[in-house]
From Swiss-Prot:
The gene is INS. One of its GO terms (cellular component) is extracellular space. SMART domains: IlGF. One of its GO terms (molecular function) is hormone activity. Residues 57-85 form a propeptide. The keyword Signal applies. Insulin decreases blood glucose concentration. It increases cell permeability to monosaccharides, amino acids and fatty acids. It accelerates glycolysis, the pentose phosphate cycle, and glycogen synthesis in liver. The lineage of its organism: Eukaryota, Metazoa, Chordata, Craniata, Vertebrata. Gene3D superfamilies: Insulin-like. One of its GO terms (biological process) is negative regulation of gene expression. This is Insulin. Heterodimer of a B chain and an A chain linked by two disulfide bonds. Keywords: Carbohydrate metabolism, Cleavage on pair of basic residues, Disulfide bond, Glucose metabolism, Hormone, Secreted, Signal.
Amino acid sequence: MALWTRLLPLLALLALWAPAPAQAFVNQHLCGSHLVEALYLVCGERGFFYTPKARREAENPQAGAVELGGGLGGLQALALEGPPQKRGIVEQCCTSICSLYQLENYCN
């Protein structure tokens, strides 16, 4: 009984110092399997769109190929455009940091 009364104030302090579940997750770098697990956590039963890279390549082996059609004119147009702007979940949550609210945008 005496041990319990000594531990109670310590447990109360730990409970006050512990971050709320949403605050513990607010802004993080999430890459690979950690990103997928976070999406499972956030989306729950709604689910999210996910196709593993190996499966994507098996279904469409030409998906990564760049088609330049148009000869030299096509190359010049690509050179003027610069690198493509990537705005996917990997750029948003792995390269940069993202919040739970940003992850929810990728739920079904």
